[in-house]
Amino acid sequence: MRFLDFFRVVPQYLIPQHLLSKGMHWFMQVKQPWIKNNTIKLLTKIYKIDIQEAADEEIENYPHFNAFFTRALKPDARPIDPTKNAWCSPADGIISQSQVIHGKTLIQAKCHEYSLDALLGGDIEYAKHFIDGDSAVIYLSPKDYHRIHMPVDAKLHSMTYVPGDLFAVNPTTVRNVEGLFARNERLIIRFENEHGVFCLIMVGAIFVGSMETIWQGKITPDYQPTIQHWDYQEDDLSYSKGDEIGRFNMGSTVVLLSPKGKMPGLGEIEKNTPIQMGQMLAQYAEYNFSTQDEHSPE
């Protein structure tokens, strides 16, 4: 571990992560104008947030800091790539990791690996979909747009909340905390379409005040000690590419998983590539649509 990394990472093992995140959630709901307006102005300057992209550019119009952080953008701020059978990025950020999965093993950083089984909360059967598949990790910093959108047309299958730690998910922590994405609190969201299945995972982090989806509402910060599961197969919840599906407060990470051969370009994106929601990530490989994923979810 690098000298400076030691002082950035080790304290995270010692602090009350969930208590601090609940405190951040409370602070982000403060409505006193002089507090929330000055906080927004300060952080806009520190993180160089482009307020001109916002649907509402007037800081005073946001009821609290959370409303600003999850602000809507102007309709033309994030055009959705129209390429047929292509995935667009579900979020703003950088591609912090893009890889072909080796069996069930994913590389987090040099000397650090984690397994599909662990990432997916111990769901060994579901993990079989993604053996030798492709994966991309998008890191959202505090300056980024914090709404999550559909990468492609699909039907919602199910969702699982997995409790866990709340380490930061910045590059320093990724380098030094083993199995970070498989140990942090997360939402595992399963989708299916005519191409088969895919998975989008929202990973929590320290000071991420809450995670929420449009179909289930706010999931955190009410920490749950056990895995929670929701099945939507009977609800017929279908979404189009570019539809909003969830939100983060502050910054965090989205992990995408695709089965082997379905989205080969997903695992070949250059590391640290900046990306905006709506820009193309990769395209589905051409194949006979009558041949469906043999591990189609049940």
UniProtKB/Swiss-Prot annotation:
Membrane-related topology note: Peripheral membrane protein
Marked site (Cleavage (non-hydrolytic)) residue numbers: G251, S252
Cofactor(s) needed by this chain: pyruvate
EC number: 4.1.1.65
Catalysed reaction, written as an equation: a 1,2-diacyl-sn-glycero-3-phospho-L-serine + H(+) = a 1,2-diacyl-sn-glycero-3-phosphoethanolamine + CO2
A cellular component term, taken from the record's GO annotations: plasma membrane
Post-translational modification: Is synthesized initially as an inactive proenzyme. Formation of the active enzyme involves a self-maturation process in which the active site pyruvoyl group is generated from an internal serine residue via an autocatalytic post-translational modification. Two non-identical subunits are generated from the proenzyme in this reaction, and the pyruvate is formed at the N-terminus of the alpha chain, which is derived from the carboxyl end of the proenzyme.
Modified residues (Pyruvic acid (Ser)): S252
Active-site residues, as the UniProt record annotates them: D92, H149, S252
GO BP, sorted A to Z: phosphatidylethanolamine biosynthetic process
Main location: membrane
Function: Catalyzes the formation of phosphatidylethanolamine (PtdEtn) from phosphatidylserine (PtdSer).
Protein name, UniProt field: Phosphatidylserine decarboxylase proenzyme
Natural source organism: Hydrogenovibrio crunogenus (strain DSM 25203 / XCL-2)
Gene: psd
